[in-house]
């Protein structure tokens, strides 16, 4: 059974579909954090037009966040999954095997990230919201001038009715 996670944000809602069979540990971490409310009220701290939107750090600095496994956990990189276009859900990291809670969604093809970041899902609906986020004004550190925030994240089993 596929797992979907819906994010209600200050700019609208979007849903991601998790690749449980391709990145089981990453998907379990992400879904568990979402279910626990870890991502609620967390800002998108880094937005780069035509590249990606990044969030998942409760400190809002881009340096924080932890996983359900402790501080950091290993990559689950697969050669058959690539950053081929907009809407790819991938883990942010600071080098090999440094995954925590931060993630990004691509706004365009980003092939230079292949083999460096764990891809664990894709945007299933609400890509227009993500594209609008990619257009917000930012400062010289790629931080939005007006806060863009996750209000609530919730796990939805695909195929189930709410």
Curated annotation (Swiss-Prot):
Isomerase found in the keyword field: yes
Write out the GO MF terms: peptidyl-prolyl cis-trans isomerase activity
SUPFAM superfamilies linked? Cyclophilin-like (SSF50891)
Looking at the record, the residues that make up the PPIase cyclophilin-type domain are 1-155
Q: Please list the reactions this protein catalyses.
A: [protein]-peptidylproline (omega=180) = [protein]-peptidylproline (omega=0)
**Mind telling me which residue stretches traverse the membrane in this protein?**
none
EC no. given is: 5.2.1.8
Q: Which GO terms describe its cellular component?
A: catalytic step 2 spliceosome
Superkingdom of this protein's organism:
Eukaryota
Q: Which UniProt keywords apply?
A: Isomerase, Rotamase
- The answer, when asked if Isomerase is one of the entry's keywords, is yes
- Kindly state a single biological-process term from the GO annotations of this entry: mRNA splicing, via spliceosome
What is its biological role?
A: PPIases accelerate the folding of proteins. It catalyzes the cis-trans isomerization of proline imidic peptide bonds in oligopeptides.
Family membership, please give it.
Belongs to the cyclophilin-type PPIase family. PPIL1 subfamily.
Q: State the name under which the record lists this protein.
A: Peptidyl-prolyl cis-trans isomerase-like 1
Origin organism is: Emericella nidulans (strain FGSC A4 / ATCC 38163 / CBS 112.46 / NRRL 194 / M139)
